[in-house]
Amino acid sequence: MAEVSVQRILLLVVSLAKCLEGTKLLAHLKKCGDLECETLISRVLALRDYTGPDCRYLNFTTGEEISVYVKLGGDREDLWAGSKGKDFGFFPRDAVEIEEVFISEEVEMPTKSDFLCLLGEGYIFGSEQSELNSEDDEEHMYPYEKDEDQNYNIYEGDFQPEPDLYAAAEGTLLEDQIPASEAPDDFRFSSEWKAWEGAGSQGGGEQDYTADSDQDLPSLSKPERQGWFGLGTEEAEEKVFESDTEPTQELALEEESDLEKLHSGEPQVELEQEPKSETLEFSSVPDEEYELESETESILKPQASGWFGEGLTSYLGFGNEEAGLELLSKESNPPLQDIPSSVPPDEEVPAPCREISTDKEDAVINDSSVLSPSWFYYGFGMLGFTNADEDNIVSDKGENEDGEVDNLKHPIGSDFDPEKEQERKIVTVETEDQAGTESVLEKTDESGSMQYLKKFFDNPWGFQSLPEDTELPFSKKMLDQDDIVENDKIEELSTENSPTGSMKDPVMLASRYVLSDIDSEVELPMEEHEGVHFKPSSSKRNEDDSNSWADPEELSVAQTDGSAEGALLDTQLVSPKEHAADFQLLKYLLQIDVYGFMSSALSPIEILLESVVAALPEDMRADFNPSGFSLELAVCVLSVGLLAVVLFLWRGFRSIRSRFYVGREKKLALELSALIEEKCKLLDKVSIVQKEYEGLESSLKEASFEKESTEAQSLEFVEGSQISEATYENLEQSKSKLEDEILLLEEKLEEERAKHSEQDELMADISKRIQSLEDESKSLKSQVAEAKTTFRIFEINEERLKGAIKDALNENSQLQESQKQLLQETEMMKEQVNDLDKQKVALEESRAQAEQALSEKESQIETLVTSLLKMKDWAAVLGEADDGNLDLDMKSGLENTAALDNQPKGALKKLIYAAKLNASLKALEGERNQVYTQLSEVDQVKEDLTEHIKSLESKQASLQSEKTEFESESQKLQQKLKVITELYQENEMKLHRKLTVEENYRLEKEEKLSKVDEKISHATEELETCRQRAKDLEEELERTIHSYQGQVISHEKKAHDNWLAARTLERNLNDLRKENAHNRQKLTETEFKFELLEKDPYALDVPNTAFGREHSPYGPSPLGRPPSETRAFLSPPTLLEGPLRLSPLLPGGGGRGSRGPENLLDHQMNTERGESSYDRLSDAPRAPSDRSLSPPWEQDRRMTAHPPPGQPYSDPALQRQDRFYPNSGRLSGPAELRSYNMPSLDKVDGPVPSEMESSGNGTKDNLGNSNVPDSPIPAECEAAGRGFFPPPFPPVRDPLFPVDPRSQFMRRGPSFPPPPPGSIYAAPRDYFPPRDFPGPPLPPFPGRTVYAPRGFPPYLPPRAGFFPPPPHPESRSELPPDLIPPSKEPAADPPETQEA
C-alpha cells in the first residue's frame, strides 16, 4: 500500500510539474551569434520552395536569400530561424544552401520561449493556444495537427507516462495537463481509452459498459475549457454587451458544433470498431422523447450563463429572466445518434448501473445545451454567481437525497471499484426508501418563504454542518480514480455519522434540497466533464412530480420512463410560471447570500483537503479525521485556495475588462462607420448642391444677358432721336463692370503667371541643387572608389612585402644552414689536416730514419768497397766475379761483415753473401723509391689541403659578408615594414575619418535631399493647384469672354436690325424730304416764273442762271444753303464703348468719328478685344455729314476734288487702290465691320481717314436707293471721306456720275483742274457753288497725300492662356495688316515687323 501511495504522490507531483511547465517550445537549446541572438550568423540561399505549417515558419521560394540568426539545437537541429525582408520564422536546414558565413563561433544557450506568432491563425503561446484560437474561428486550429513528423508531436514526446501508471491512475490526467482544445484528438482519446481499458480490467462488466458509454465525455472538454480565464468564443465576446442571453446562445451553438465535430472525428470511429449494440435504455427511447428533449433543451439553454453564469446578471439586477424562451429550435443539442453509445452485446448490465449509464447519457445530452464555457470549472460558484432558476436544469428529486448526493457527485472512477460499487448500491437502496418522505417535504417546502428562511438560517460556518449536497467534485487534474473512490467512502461515512445529516429534520432537508439545486446547477458543467452523473430516483417519485405538471402529453412521456432520463426530462419540462415565485425569492436571497459566498470560497478548500487526504498513504489516512485535521495542512490548503481564488478573481476581472474593451471597440467601429456614411452622404449632398448652385449661377447669368438683350431690343428709334441717356449709361456701366472684371481676371492671371514663373525658377533652382547634389554624390562615390582602390593597392603592396620578407627570411635561414654546414665541413677538414700533419710528421721521422740507415749503408758500402779493393786478389783467383757481381757481393757483405770476418776464408760463401747483399740493396732501393713517392704524394695532398682551406676561408669570409649584408637588408626591410604599417594605419585612419565625415556629409545631404524632396513635393502640389486654378480661371475667363461675345453679337445683331430699320425709315424720310424740296423748288420756280411772267411775259426764253442751282437737281435753295434736314444721320449702335458713330460703313473712321494717328499697341489690343476704331470720338475736326445720308448736292460737292499743285491727275499714285473684301454671308453692319477693320494711313497735313465698305452693303443700298435716280450704278473707285475738295468755279455741266458709297465699287470722274489756293481740306460750310455748269463732271478725288498706304507691322498674338491688358480708352481697333491686300503702289516706308 505504501508503494501505491508513493506512486500516487509522484504522479501528482509530475502532473503538477508538467502543468506548470507547458509545451510551447520547439527545442530547449538554440545556437546564436551572440547572447541576444541579434547577430547575423550566415546568409543562405533557398534550394526549393517551402511553405510552413503555421505562421511561425518562414515561407520562401527557390532562389531567395535568407539571413540566419538562430539555429535550434537538441532534437530540432534541422530547424533554423531567420528573416527574409520583414518576415521572420523557422525553416528546415535541408531546404537552403549556405552562401556566406559571417560568424564561425556560435553561442549555445537554452531556449526561454519561442517568438509570439501574431500573423497566422492566432497566438502560438503555451497552453492557451485553443482559447486564443477559438476567438478567430469555431474550428480550432492545431499547429501540430498537420505535421506527421514525430518531432513535431510535442504531446506524445514531451510527457508519456509508463503503462503501469494507467492501472492505478486516471487516464485523463494527461488530458488535463494538456488542454483539450490544444492537444490532438487522437492523442487525447487514445490516452483516455487506455486508462479506461486498464481500469475496466479491474472492474467488471458493468464498469466496461460505463466506460463505453462515457467515451464521448472528453469531447466536451474543449468547449468547457474554451471558457477558462474568460477566453470564450468570438461570438460570445461580440454579443456580451448587447444582451444577457446572446452570449449563452452563441456559446451553446458553438458547443453543438464542437460536439458534432468531435463525435464525427477519429475517436468515434475508433470506438465504433468493436462490435457493439445499443442498450435497451437508449433503444427504448422513442422519437417523441427526442423531440421533447430538443424542445426542453432550447428552453434550458439560455439559462446557462457566459463565463460566470446567470447569477451575476440576477444579482446585479440586469438579467433577463425569460430570455431562454427566445431561442429557436435550431440552437438545441445535436441528436442522440451523434453520441456513441454501443456496448458489447454479451455483457449484462445490472439495473442500477443501467440507470446510471442512462442518466449519464442524459447528462451528456442535456449538458451540451445547458453547459456553457465558464472561466473556471472547479465546481464552485465564484461569489455566488450561480443560476437562480435551478429547477430548469436539475431534477427535483435527485438532489435532496443524502445517499444519492454522493453518487451524483462522484466521478467516473467510482464505478470502477467493485467494493465501492457495492457500498454505493446499498446507499442507493436506502435513499430510494426515503423518496416518499422527501417528496412530501419537497411539496411542503415549495413556498418561497420557507426556502428563504431555510437557507438564510442554515449554519454555513463549518464543514461538519454542511449537507452532503454541498460537497463538490474535484478536478481530474489532481486525483485519480481510486483516490476519488476512497474519498467518496469517507464522505459517505462521515455524512451518515454527522448529527446534521439525519433525514428527520424537514427544515434541514428542505435547505439541503434548495442548496443541492443551486450547487448542482453550478457544478453541472464540471460534473459532466468528470463523468459525474445523476442518480435516478424511484418511479413513485416521478409519478408524484408528474402529477403537478400541466401538459398531459408530457406527463405520459415522463411516466413511461422510470429512469433518470425521464426524471430529468420531467424536470426540464416544468413551466417557468410555476417557479416564478421560487426564482424571485432566490434572486433576493442571492443579494444577501453570505452563505453562497462562503460555501463557494470554502468548497475548493474542502475538496483540496479531501484530495490531499486521499493522496496520503493508507496508514496516514486512517488516523486522519476531516473534522480534526492538523493545523499545518489546513494553513497550507487555505493559503493555496486563497491564492487560487485571488488568481482567478484577477483573471476574471481581466476577462471582463477585455470584453468591455471589445464591446467598446465594436461600438466605436459602428459609430465610425455611421459617421463615415454620414460624411459620404453629406459630400454627395454638397456636390449636388454645388451643381445646383452652378446651374443657378449660369441660369442667372443667362437671365441677366437676356435681360440686357431685351433692354437692347426695347430701344426704339424715332425720327431724328438718339438712344436714351439712361440706357446708354446702363450700357456704359455694364461695360465698365465687365472691363473691371476682365482687369481683375487679367491681374489674377498675371499673378498666377508670376507665381508660375517663380515656381519654375524654384523648380530650376531645385533641379540645379539636385544636380549639384548628384554630382557631389557621384564625386563622393568616385572618391570612395578611389579610396577603395588605394586601399586595395596598399593591401596588394603589403602582401608583396610580406612575400618578399618571407622569401628573405627563408633565404637567410638557408644561408645560415649552409654556413653551419660549411663550418662543420671546415672542422672536419681541420681534423683531416691534423691527421695528415701527424702522418707527415711520422713519415718525416721514418724518412730521417731511412736516411740515417741509408747513410750507414753508404758508409758500410764504402768500407766494403775499400775492403773489396783490398781483396782484388781474391777476384783474380776465383775469376768468377765481375764488376757487377762484385758490387753485389760488397753490398751483401756489408750485412754479413761479421760473417765475413768470421769466415774470411771461404770464397764461395763470400760470393753468395755478395749476391745476397746485392739483392738486399735492390730491395732497399725500391723501398726508398716508394718512400719518395709517398712523400711526394703527401706533399701534394698537403698543398691541396692548404689550397682547399684557403678557398674555404675565402668562402667563409664571403658568406660572412653576405650574412651581414642580408642582416642589414632584413633590418632595413623590417624598418620599411614598420614604416609602411604605420603609414598604412595612418592612411587607414585618415580614410576612416574621411569616410565617416563623408558618411555624415552624405547623411546630411540625404536629409537635405529629403527636405528638398518634401519641398519639391509641396512645390509640385502648389504648382498643380496653381495650374488647376489658372486653368479654372482661364476656363472661367473663356466662358465669360464667350458669353460676352455672344451677348455683344446678339446685341450687334439686334442693333444692326434696328439700324436697318432706321435706315429704311431715313431713306423714306429722305425721299419725302426730296419730294418736299422738289415740290418747294417747283413752287419757288413757279413763283419765280410767275413773277417773271408778271414782270416780263417773255422771260421764259432766258437761260436760268440762278445762284445755287448747280448743286441740286431740283434747283438751288432759296436761302442759298442746304436744307436743315441734311444733317448726318447716326449710325446704328453696337453697344460697345465710345460715343455714337456716324455710319457702319466707314471702317476708317470717316466723318465725325475720324481722328488722328493712334498707337499701334492700342490698335492691336482693341483689335483683340473686338473694339472698333469708329467707336470713339477724336480730337480732329469732324466732317459735316456722312456721305451715304447727305443730300445729293453734298454728295456732288464732295465728289469734286482738285489735285495738289504740280501733280497731274493721271499719276497712278493719286489713284486709290480698290479694295475688295469677302462677303461674310450675312447682312453687313457693325458685326461685319468688327471682323474687317482697316488700319489708319499715314497722314501728312492732317487726318485723312479712309472710308471702306463691305461687299454685302451694295445690294442693300442699291435696294434702298431704288427711289433715287441714277443710284444703282456701281462705282469704279472708292469714295473719299471728308477731305474732298470742292470745285472752285462752276464748270460746264455734264451728266452726273451718281455714286453710292454703300456699294462695292466707286467710280472716279475724269481729271479736273486743281482748285485755287484756299482751304486745302474742303470748302467752307457756307460755300455752295452752283450746281449746273457746263463741261465734264468733276472727278471725285479724296484729300489725301501722294504717298502710298503703309502697312503696319503685325502685333504678336498672345500665347494660350494669356489675355492682353486693357486698352487705352482713346485707342481704337483697326483691321490687322495681314488682311490688307498688297498694294501695287510703291511704299514710301518699308513695313516694320515686330517679332517676339
UniProtKB/Swiss-Prot annotation:
Tissue expression remark: Isoform 1 is expressed in liver (at protein level). Isoform 2 is highly expressed in liver and weakly in testis.
Region (Mediates interaction with MIA3): 651-1243
InterPro entries xrefs: cTAGE_MIA/OTOR, SH3-like_dom_sf, SH3_domain
Transmembrane segments: 629-649
This protein's record includes keyword Endoplasmic reticulum: yes
UniProt free text on domains: The proline-rich domain (PRD) contains repeated PPP motifs. A single PPP motif is necessary and sufficient to mediate interaction with the COPII coat subunits SEC23A and SEC23B. The coiled coil domains mediate interaction with MIA3. The first coiled coil domain mediates interaction with PREB.
Name by which UniProt lists this protein: Melanoma inhibitory activity protein 2
Annotated organism of origin: Mus musculus
Gene that encodes it: Mia2
